[in-house]
Amino acid sequence: DDALAAPARIDVNWLLRSMFQSVPGRGGMPGSTGLLPPQWLDEEMVNAAVRAVGRTLQASLLSYGAPQGYLPLRKQLSMLLRQSTLIEVSPQQIVTTLGATQALDLIARTVIVPGDHVLVDEPCNGNLIKLIRLCGGVPIGVPRLADGPDVGALAQILGRHKVRAFFCNSTFHNPTGAGLSPKVAFAVVKLAVEHDFLIVEDDVYGDFFPGVRQTFAGLGDLEHVVYIGSFSKSLSASLRIGYIACGLQLLEPLIRLKLLTSVAVPGLISRVTSAFSANGTGIKNKVPLCIAII
């Protein structure tokens, strides 16, 4: 396959294109997708959710979805976050998106002004660096350690630059798989308050954690933390459902930008995701298997 052949230069564009190609002769998928093998996911539960929604199709499915997102799903997300991360957020503070990719894009375009210094994990997803640069931001790497961002290095950077935001993973950092300790989470949030920058917490792999997980947003400061989650990794990439939990100061700007760029998340996939969530997150049943194989 030409798209998988090694190019003269391996860059973000090549990596993105390779995500949609099968691995020749192996029947698998490239590692760049960040997805689990289909057999690790709950295909039958997804099928059941699709059938359930199909039996109760309503006229509302023939129109645009709600700009902020399907309310029953946002209520479920509020409960899910409280149970799995200790994040206290109301459904009114949640915006659904077309996957975590759109969530990152909306936040970046809302908060970054050309010339802003924007921190990222080092290493991090190359797509994120390109997105920040598209918004005119100047990305600066913060070394990632086994228990989270290097707090000492972060403090040094903050002493040299006025920082607008820090985009980082919490659970299962991409690409190292590192976690986040309570001590480091508290230290990073404390620096965010002292230096007045926004932590953009990308927790798309959080559903793979078997218990209550440590997050930045779980420390109770949605004024300085924006939380991103997604069902694309743990449920189905084709459903493209992500979400943002944030403080009220960012809520309306994000909804307005979402309206301008995509109008709404389709009502059908929102209802399918809601029906699936009502029966529990399928990946939770697969966590012991995932850990055993890894």
Annotate each language-model stretch with its function.
Residues L36, S170-H173, K233:
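Short glycine-rich anion-binding loops that position phosphate/pyrophosphate groups of nucleotides
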Residues D202, I269-T273:
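Acidic catalytic patch
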Residues V212, G220-P253, V265-L268:
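Active-site PLP attachment segment
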Residues F172, Q249-L250, T281:
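Short, well-ordered alpha-helical scaffold segment located
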Residues D1-R51, I255, L259-V265, S274-G280, ...:
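N-terminal basic, amphipathic alpha-helical segments
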Residues V50-D196, V200, G206-G220, V226:
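Conserved core of the PLP fold type I
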Residues D2, T33, R144, P210, ...:
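Active-site donor-binding loop signature of nucleotide-sugar glycosyltransferases
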